[in-house]
């Protein structure tokens, strides 16, 4: 079963939103909270801050299917516009969904079966170019908590609708030195009516 509560306050230029969620199944119980603040401090210049925290009250699952995901959501409840659900490689496997941990890069940390906390911030550098920084703390059962952080550039072509993320440096080192760098590029694309509504409410400012 699923229970959730969400709220959004403010205007198109300065707003705060949050969502609290509880999931209960025969083999797990978990709680999560997601909060985001967005402000346009000058014409076409914005600053965003997002935090996520999730914990299992109990977890008897035999695999990681219901884990909190650090970067790529599993979306077993079909809540998001995830276009490559079964893809482990290729273009659609690099889709970025701003849900759960929502880090752009993760290294070897992919999910957490005990608790997960992440924080992300981004600000406009020039027009539709943003710089971002993010950090996450990942804890799975019988393992020590681990930390992963990263920085990069986002081409914010259409806010919350079409964005491309280019990691630059993270806790594993300089991403650009990796020959497989193109696989680290993430794209965000949403065709949901709610996203389109937010697009038109902001595009006039």
Question: Can you annotate each of these PLM segments?
Answer:
Residues 127-129, 133-139:
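Long, low-hydrophobicity, solvent-exposed regions enriched in small/turn-prone and acidic residues
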Residues 146-176:
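Strand-loop-strand
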Residues 1-124, 141:
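C-terminal outer-membrane beta-barrel translocator/porin domains of Gram-negative envelope proteins
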Residues 65-72, 146-148, 181-186:
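Flexible, surface-exposed loop regions and adjacent strand-edge segments
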Residues 117-122, 135, 151-156:
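Conserved C-terminal beta-signal and adjacent last beta-strands/turns
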Residues 52-54, 132-134, 156, 165-167:
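Generic beta-strand/beta-sheet core signal
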Residues 155-161, 181-205:
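Outer-membrane beta-barrel "beta-signal"
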Residues 46-48, 128-130, 161-163:
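Membrane-spanning beta-strand positions in outer-membrane beta-barrel proteins
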């Amino acid at each position: 079963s699923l229970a959730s509560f969400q709220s959004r306050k403010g205007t198109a230029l300065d707003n705060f939103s949050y969502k609290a969620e509880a999931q209960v199944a025969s083999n797990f119980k978990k709680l999560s909270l997601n909060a985001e603040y967005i402000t346009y401090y000058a014409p076409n210049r914005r600053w965003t801050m997002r935090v996520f925290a999730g914990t299992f009250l109990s977890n008897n699952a035999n695999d990681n299917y219901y884990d909190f995901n650090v970067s790529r959501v599993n979306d077993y409840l079909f809540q998001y516009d995830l276009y490559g659900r079964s893809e482990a490689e290729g273009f659609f496997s690099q889709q970025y969904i701003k849900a759960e941990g929502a880090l752009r890069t993760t290294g070897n940390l992919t999910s957490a079966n005990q608790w997960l906390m992440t924080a992300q911030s981004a600000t406009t550098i020039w027009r539709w170019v943003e710089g971002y920084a993010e950090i996450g703390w990942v804890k799975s059962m019988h393992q020590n908590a681990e930390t992963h952080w990263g920085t990069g550039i986002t081409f914010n072509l259409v806010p919350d609708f079409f964005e491309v993320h280019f990691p630059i440096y993270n806790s594993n080192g300089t991403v650009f030195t990796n020959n497989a760098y193109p696989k680290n590029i993430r794209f965000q694309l949403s065709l949901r009516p709610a996203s389109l509504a937010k697009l038109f409410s902001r595009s006039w400012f």
